């Protein structure tokens, strides 16, 4: 009997604590003005650094603004590490994701680790953009996106791509030959996405490429190999194609998973001859 009364008493105390907690939260909510709750931005406001602000531009040149970042795929969220963190849920992240993609007065966007595409796409199109999205591999859960502005703007807007290519970086060696199975022994499932976007008004356009290179910090050789494949692909557009768009400016933006002191960066910026010995020492350690 005593044990039964103890359990009842504990249950009543728990219920009372829960009621008081609910009352407190309702009082706080009621005392907060609606405008304060509704005006909270989806993303933090940040100041951007202006670069090349005073560079002379040809009179008939077009200016475009491109943003690029890794979206951090929802499919890669480790909820078991943060079981109480509701900020990792898609319904919480989604407004911020869309705001970051569309609210920086950008004309173009290159994004990596994009998934939940059915949830993101309607908001992107409503904001005046269209996009192409590719995973490259059926078993891969996230992919690359190139986004362009379609709504009238004081700068550039774009029509749908006149050309698109997806390159599976595992399937091509650095000299351009197709390989039987993954190149060397790494299976990375990394890809390159390229589109040729014509301007909505007037002649010309822009070729936009994005990629997400191999992530592991120990394997610099694989990143350098993938970068070589990418540069060969982009260079071949100039040499092989007879299309008008092949002469358009090319922009490569993406997540290279690397740093400015790396061999990959040195190779991409044309400094290989100056640092040949250092590059060889760095890359041979991770070559398979």
Regions found by a protein language model. Give the residues of each.
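N-terminal, active-site-proximal structural segment of metallo-dependent hydrolase catalytic domains
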Residues: 1-126, 136-143, 281
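Structured beta-strand-rich core segments of catalytic domains in phosphoester-bond hydrolases
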Residues: 36-59, 63, 108-215, 219
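Generic structural signal for small/hydrophobic residues in well-ordered secondary structure
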Residues: 69-70, 97, 101, 147, ...
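Active-site metal-binding loops of divalent metal-dependent hydrolases
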Residues: 71, 114, 213, 254-256
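Feature marks short, surface-exposed loop/turn motifs that line or immediately flank catalytic pockets
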Residues: 73-75, 214-217, 260
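Glycine-rich phosphate-binding loop signature in dinucleotide/nucleotide-binding domains
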Residues: 103-105, 199-203, 237-247
């Amino acid at each position: 009997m005593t044990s039964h009364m103890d359990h009842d008493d504990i249950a009543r105390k728990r219920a009372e604590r829960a009621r008081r907690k609910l009352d407190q939260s309702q009082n706080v909510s009621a005392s907060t003005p609606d405008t304060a709750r509704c005006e909270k931005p989806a993303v933090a406001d940040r100041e951007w650094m202006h670069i090349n602000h005073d560079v002379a531009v040809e009179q008939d040149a077009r200016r475009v603004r491109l943003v690029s970042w890794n979206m951090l795929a929802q499919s890669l969220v480790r909820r078991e590490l943060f079981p109480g963190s509701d900020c990792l849920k898609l319904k919480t992240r989604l407004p911020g994701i869309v705001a970051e993609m569309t609210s920086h007065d950008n004309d173009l966007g290159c994004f990596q680790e994009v998934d939940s595409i059915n949830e993101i796409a309607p908001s992107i199109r409503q904001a005046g953009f269209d996009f192409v999205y590719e995973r490259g591999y059926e078993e891969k859960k996230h992919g690359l996106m190139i986004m362009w502005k379609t709504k009238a703007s004081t700068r550039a807007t774009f029509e749908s791509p006149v050309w698109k290519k997806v390159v599976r970086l595992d399937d091509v060696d650095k000299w351009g030959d197709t390989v039987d199975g993954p190149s060397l022994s790494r299976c990375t499932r990394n890809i390159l996405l390229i589109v040729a976007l014509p301007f909505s008004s007037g002649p010309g356009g822009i070729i936009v490429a994005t990629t997400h290179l191999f992530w592991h910090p120990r394997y610099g050789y694989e990143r350098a190999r993938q970068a070589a494949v990418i540069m060969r692909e982009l260079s071949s557009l100039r040499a092989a194609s007879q299309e008008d768009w092949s002469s358009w400016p090319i922009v490569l933006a993406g997540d290279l998973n690397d740093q400015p002191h790396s061999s990959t960066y040195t190779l991409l910026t044309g400094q290989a001859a100056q640092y040949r010995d250092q590059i060889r020492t760095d890359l041979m350690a991770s070559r398979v």
